[in-house]
Amino acid sequence: MPTPSHLKNPLCFDFRAARRVPETHAWPGLDDHPVVDGGGGGGEDAVPVVDVGAGDAAARVARAAEQWGAFLLVGHGVPAALLSRVEERVARVFSLPASEKMRAVRGPGEPCGYGSPPISSFFSKLMWSEGYTFSPSSLRSELRRLWPKSGDDYLLFCDVMEEFHKEMRRLADELLRLFLRALGLTGEEVAGVEAERRIGERMTATVHLNWYPRCPEPRRALGLIAHTDSGFFTFVLQSLVPGLQLFRRGPDRWVAVPAVAGAFVVNVGDLFHILTNGRFHSVYHRAVVNRDRDRVSLGYFLGPPPDAEVAPLPEAVPAGRSPAYRAVTWPEYMAVRKKAFATGGSALKMVSTDAAAAADEHDDVAAAADVHA
């Protein structure tokens, strides 16, 4: 019997034609933990909201990063009309014929291009999604792979994404200042100025586009496996179709992030967890799919350049204590993370200097990773 095409190349799988979820895409254990609503109401599972311009923004960032590792960001000043155009262009990319998208397929070890989620290579099951990754610094050359003859789609996409990148770098710098203020480092102090300069001036950006097609059996499939982001922090722009979920303990549950028009979801990443000595913790999250509507999202990832060592800021280490984590570069940490995926361990534990001092959340969410098998 010939091998099904989606086993030879998962990108050949036709989500639109699927009437059932094949075993290649079926994940066990998706209902092991309840899902609760993270919308308003002020309950303990209401996802924190931070208004960038509010007087207590730094305090709210601190509380959210310490207790959740994520929050909804509003009042950020990125025009709503621009966000609508971004979402429209993202949807357009994934509406292209498969033969055109395959022109830009991401090869083994390549950071940019079209393909399955980058973390999919660590798992035996396939995810109900497609993605496209690019660096804003090489946007126009990268997208020529998708649109080799240029044309209106190419020009519109590049123009919109360049405008979006400019706004997001401004916002990233603003949020970095809030994070540092939340740690007690202000721009009026030498330490605060130096930290902002050292981190902000070399911070790099990567954009990942996601498409989660409607699914005939959404309780058997997963758009994106439970994971933490590896970098500093991520802005997630999601459409008004919900699907992002955050993992919380006590009791174990998934919190469904509400789809709020014009808001970004901010996720703390592992390297920021290290930079803050574990005070601001990275968050396990996943993307689920639904039966009726496609969903698109965009992740704007911030992190250090590959040659920069990331270690706990002195101001984040309690007096009389040693740093909880050793210094690592991003590539070094990704190698550790690959080993952690293979063994079911915690990458943060692997780079900790003292397991007790590290006290990271990742052991607590081990149950959330049961679907890795």
Swiss-Prot record:
Cofactor (UniProt): L-ascorbate; Fe(2+)
Q: Please name the pathway.
A: Plant hormone biosynthesis; gibberellin biosynthesis
Matches recorded under PROSITE patterns: FE2OG_OXY
Q: Which UniProt keywords apply?
A: Dioxygenase, Iron, Metal-binding, Oxidoreductase
Return the Gene3D superfamilies for the record.
B-lactam Antibiotic, Isopenicillin N Synthase, Chain
What is known about its induction?
Induced by uniconazole. Down-regulated by gibberellin (GA3).
Record's keyword annotation contains Metal-binding:
yes
Q: What else is known?
A: Plants silencing G3OX2 exhibit reduced plant height.
Matching entries from PANTHER family are given as:
2-OXOGLUTARATE (2OG) AND FE(II)-DEPENDENT OXYGENASE SUPERFAMILY PROTEIN-RELATED (PTHR47990)
Give the UniProt family note: Belongs to the iron/ascorbate-dependent oxidoreductase family.
What is this protein identified as?
Gibberellin 3-beta-dioxygenase 2
Q: Look up and give the organism this protein is from.
A: Oryza sativa subsp. japonica
The record's gene field reads GA3OX2
